[in-house]
Amino acid sequence: MILVNTDYISGKEFEMLGLVKGSTIQSKHIGNDIAQSFKTLVGGELKSYNEMMNEARALATKRMVVEAEELGADAIVNIRYASSAIMQGAAEVIAYGTAVKFINK
């Protein structure tokens, strides 16, 4: 599956199959959350939250790809990500794009 954030793939013609998306809501262990809150007092990277967001993006992307495969897509174009805080220590990540099928592979 080809994944791009542009609305084209160089050298490929395709037909659009429709919108595909994947999402997840992730949270961290309460102990990690407390440790990270202390880190905000002194500054620096919040590695635990970085890991959480990376995991969430990967899972949302995987779910989007599964949806595209169910449509028989060869690629997903114009991929975008959005995130929002659901509550302290939890975030929702959404991946979405347009599933396409190549013409004259």
PLM regions and their residue ranges:
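Detector for methionine-enriched segments
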Residues: 1, 16, 52-53, 64, ...
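N-terminal presequence-like segments and the immediate start of the first folded domain
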Residues: 1-32, 70-74, 93-105
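Short, solvent-exposed loop/turn elements at beta->coil junctions and helix N-caps
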Residues: 6-9, 81-86
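Short, well-ordered alpha-helical segments
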Residues: 20, 25, 33-80
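A generic membrane alpha-helix/interface feature
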Residues: 39-41, 90, 98
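Membrane-proximal amphipathic alpha-helices
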Residues: 86, 91-92
